[in-house]
């Protein structure tokens, strides 16, 4: 089982059978897993912040909201809705795709990057109860 399928199964255990978001280049493999997986539905929206607000509402009603966006530009655009969910203690899982750490070492000025790979994670630490970064060849 790869990480994408594992994450989908965990979301389902917490009551989420929908994932809101906007597919981006660093989330495409995960989005393919969502598309192929039975029992979970992707809900595309036109803006990342709208995906966050929709997932927040879904979490309040169903037990756990889930949203996926791409690295940096997508994650930065979802900050207000994530902060709102955090302030209201709303259960929300935010999945953000990113280039591998090895790739960022070779090409630190890759598109969608700001500062270094920890900048985004450091910002999320202030508006979430927990953050983690998963980096492996077989993840998504």
Locate the predicted segments by residue:
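N-terminal alpha/beta PP-like core and its mobile active-site loop of ThDP/TPP-dependent enzymes
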Residues: 1-140
């Amino acid at each position: 089982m790869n990480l994408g399928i594992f994450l989908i199964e965990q979301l389902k255990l917490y009551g989420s059978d929908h994932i809101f978001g906007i597919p981006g280049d660093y989330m495409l493999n995960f989005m393919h897993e969502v598309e192929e997986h039975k029992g979970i539905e992707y809900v595309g929206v036109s803006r990342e912040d709208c995906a966050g607000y929709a997932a927040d509402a879904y979490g309040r009603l169903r037990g756990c909201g889930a949203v996926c966006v791409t690295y940096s530009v997508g994650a930065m655009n979802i900050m207000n809705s994530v902060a709102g969910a955090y302030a209201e203690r709303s259960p929300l899982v935010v999945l953000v795709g990113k280039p591998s750490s090895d790739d960022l070492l070779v090409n630190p000025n890759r598109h969608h990057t700001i500062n270094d790979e920890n900048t985004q994670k450091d910002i999320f630490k202030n508006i979430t109860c927990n953050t983690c970064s998963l980096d492996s060849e077989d993840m998504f």
